[in-house]
Amino acid sequence: MNHKVLLINGPNLNLLGRREPSVYGHQTLADIVAQLNEQAQAAGVQLEHIQSNAEFELINAIHATDAQMIIINPAAFTHTSVALRDALLGVDIPFYEVHLSNVHAREPFRHHSYLSDKAIGVICGFGAQGYEFALTAAIKRLKSAT
């Protein structure tokens, strides 16, 4: 079986490396995705990636994917998007939620997630390494299911 993971990055993550590096780090999104592609290929897993500042594009990607697992950093949509939650529940694909910063150590409005209670797991506060942790977990879960 050919395993596939969909990696979703929400609004403003295209600015990684430039936007508040003290909070989000110095790596660009392209650098992070390149590392994850290497990790996925080494495990024999296909990684599909989308980043968008538009909620509907992320929803359409969720609806259209044939991936067996999703890793999502919803960014600001974490705290606002019932639509993303409904899209994820609608396709019934297990997902991990990732945040670069520790959202619980930040402003109170960032403490609530519309996705966390439905995620397999939530990884936050590890910077870009959080994506690697999520991909490792996703690969293990996919491989154990076959």
From Swiss-Prot:
One of its GO terms (molecular function) is 3-dehydroquinate dehydratase activity. Keywords: Amino-acid biosynthesis, Aromatic amino acid biosynthesis, Lyase. Substrate binds at residues 73, 79, 86, 100-101, 110. InterPro entries: DHquinase_II, DHquinase_II_CS, DHquinase_II_sf. It catalyses: 3-dehydroquinate = 3-dehydroshikimate + H2O. SUPFAM superfamilies: Type II 3-dehydroquinate dehydratase. Pathway: Metabolic intermediate biosynthesis; chorismate biosynthesis; chorismate from D-erythrose 4-phosphate and phosphoenolpyruvate: step 3/7. The record marks 19 as: Transition state stabilizer. Homododecamer. NCBIfam families: aroQ, PRK05395.1-1, PRK05395.1-2, PRK05395.1-3, PRK05395.1-4. Catalyzes a trans-dehydration via an enolate intermediate. Belongs to the type-II 3-dehydroquinase family. This is 3-dehydroquinate dehydratase. The gene is aroQ.
